[in-house]
Amino acid sequence: VSPSRHRHPLWTRAFHGFNLVVFLVMAASGLQIYNAHPVFGGRGGATVPELFTLGGWLAGGRDWHFGFMGLCALNLGLWIALLIQRRRDRLAQSSDLATLNASSNLARRRLAAHRLIYTLMLVLLAFALMTGLAMYKPAQFWWLSGLFSFGELFGATSWHTLRVAHLATIPAIAFLTLAHATLSWRVGGWRLWRSMLA
């Protein structure tokens, strides 16, 4: 490695790789479960192409999904621990929105954007885990399931509302991941990406 070439610490690269693998497996296996009974349109509704699913059928998708659920919880725990340890650098603050809107300092605006992304990602991961647990063990986590009974006001069962909310975390997390990668590219280009990959 060239002395001038910056590399992120091994744990940072490993954590990013771990995050990506867990998300891809959870998303693909979740879409396989979705295909067994689509949220929109029931059994005759639109399905996701097999290319983007994992498991081959409902039971296979469930095996992958529930198998990685523990890793997802571990991931969330590590995320919380890291953010608490470095909360001043990573968690969004009340001034960050104002910085995005008013600051002419590009570096400060990018830092504020990163803080917002990290914080929103933490909220989304927690939300995905909570809605997943509410569907996995509805009797044990009845109080979580009950939070989604508001869907009945719009003619939907709380179970359907829960499924829609859980499914929505996939594109939301994917969007934040893309935003994080794009912002990192704008900050350091290929050099910064390479320092994370190898």
Indicate where each model-derived feature is located.
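Membrane-embedded alpha-helical bundles that constitute the cytochrome b-like, heme-associated redox core
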Residues: V1-A198
